[in-house]
């Protein structure tokens, strides 16, 4: 009993050691807890964030460096590897690989259709790729051989536009597709249009001053024609006035012979020659009009025939000077007037004046 008690007491006595062990355990537990917390903090960014970083940056890549920097800063890890990781994602590698794979496929399909380069004639051709390559890939240009270009240029020289049967025939002869022939003709028409427009613009710029000089020369040429036509009109009016003057003289002679009031003498002859010397000049009718108009009126009326010889004084030098003075302003006005006086009319007027002077001197 005592032994057992001793055992129990020993056991009881041994409890403080256990208590001591238990009392010594809390710091171990604290260390364990702190280590577990540290391990958890270490394990969290290594295990949990990768799927978080793989999903979120694809949706919002700008938010990734903001979350990564505060999490990795207490551990001393640099954020550079996290920033370099996004361009190396597998889905991005697959897309790049797909682009690289699509480009050779498209080039091989275009090469299978025909050689790819620029045509020497400057007419680029775009070929439609047969395979389902990348939608954004640019279609390349087709090169034509010299024989193909020669035949196409010949056909374009004769026909700017092709009908479909002829287009199919040319495509079969030149080993081209119908679309290639159609596009070549479209581009060739545009090139021809540009060339013609540039030539027209160049010719218009080169002929600008020459055309203006030609216009001035035409105007200068038209002026003499107008003068000549005016001279012809003056000649026609002069001849018409001569005829009318002759008819007036005949009428005057018939009237004077019918009445026979007094024999005609030198003064009556002067009166018969005096009337209307001015109808040849259109501008002189205003100044010499009263004197010239009174002649036929007085000659046609019976009182004019009854006038005695003493009333009609022979023309003196003063009267001739007055007549010339009266005629000179009319001539100056006629020269200033826009109506041109022909030389024939002027000569006829001067001849009429000289005949009057000669008749006056004879008496």
UniProtKB/Swiss-Prot annotation:
UniProt DNA-binding residue ranges? 137-196
Q: Where is the composition biased (Polar residues)?
A: 31-44, 103-113
Stored InterPro entries: HD, HD_metazoa, Homeobox_Antennapedia_CS, Homeobox_CS, Homeodomain-like_sf
Alphabetical UniProt keywords:
Developmental protein, DNA-binding, Homeobox, Nucleus, Transcription, Transcription regulation
- Residues covered by region (Disordered): 30-88, 98-117, 189-220, 268-308
Q: Name one GO cellular component term.
A: nucleus
Q: Where does this protein chiefly localize? A: nucleus
Residue interval(s) of motif Antp-type hexapeptide: 88-93
NAD: present as a keyword of the record?
no
Molecular function terms, GO-annotated: DNA-binding transcription factor activity, RNA polymerase II-specific; RNA polymerase II cis-regulatory region sequence-specific DNA binding
PANTHER family (UniProt xref): HOMEOBOX PROTEIN HOX-A2 (PTHR45664:SF3), PROTEIN ZERKNUELLT 1-RELATED (PTHR45664)
UniProt similarity note: Belongs to the Antp homeobox family. Proboscipedia subfamily.
Q: What is this protein called?
A: Homeobox protein Hox-A2a
Q: Could you tell me which species this protein originates from?
A: Takifugu rubripes (Japanese pufferfish)
């Amino acid at each position: 009993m005592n032994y057992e008690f001793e055992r129990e007491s020993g056991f009881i006595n041994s409890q403080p050691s256990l208590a001591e062990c238990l009392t010594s355990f809390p710091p171990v537990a604290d260390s364990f807890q702190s280590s577990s917390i540290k391990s958890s903090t270490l394990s969290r960014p290594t295990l949990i964030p990768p799927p978080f970083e793989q999903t979120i940056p694809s949706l919002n890549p700008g938010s990734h460096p903001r979350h990564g920097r505060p999490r990795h800063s207490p551990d001393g890890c640099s954020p550079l590897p996290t920033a370099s990781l996004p361009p190396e994602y597998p889905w991005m590698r697959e897309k790049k690989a797909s682009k690289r794979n699509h480009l050779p496929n498209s080039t091989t399909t275009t090469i299978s259709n025909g050689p790819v380069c620029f045509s020497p004639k400057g007419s680029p051709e775009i070929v439609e790729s047969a395979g389902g390559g990348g939608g954004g890939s640019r279609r390349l240009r087709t090169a034509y051989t010299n024989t193909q270009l020669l035949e196409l240029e010949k056909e374009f020289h004769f026909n700017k536009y092709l009908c479909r049967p002829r287009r199919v025939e040319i495509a079969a002869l030149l080993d081209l597709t119908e679309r290639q022939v159609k596009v070549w003709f479209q581009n060739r028409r545009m090139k021809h249009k540009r060339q013609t427009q540039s030539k027209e613009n160049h010719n218009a710029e080169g002929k600008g001053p020459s055309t203006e000089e030609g216009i001035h020369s035409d105007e200068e040429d038209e002026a003499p024609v107008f003068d000549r036509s005016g001279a012809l009109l003056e000649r026609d009016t002069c001849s018409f006035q001569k005829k009318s003057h002759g008819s007036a003289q005949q009428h005057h002679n018939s009237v004077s012979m019918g009445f026979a009031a007094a024999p005609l003498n030198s003064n009556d002859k002067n009166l018969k020659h005096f009337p209307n010397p001015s109808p040849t000049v259109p501008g002189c009718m205003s100044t010499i009009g009263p004197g010239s108009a009174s002649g036929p009126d007085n000659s046609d009326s019976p009182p004019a025939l009854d006038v005695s010889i003493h009333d009609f004084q022979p023309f003196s030098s003063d009267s001739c000077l007055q007549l010339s003075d009266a005629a000179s302003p009319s001539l100056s006005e006629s020269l200033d007037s826009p109506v041109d006086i022909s030389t024939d009319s002027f000569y006829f007027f001067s001849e009429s004046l000289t005949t009057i002077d000669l008749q006056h001197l004879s008496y």
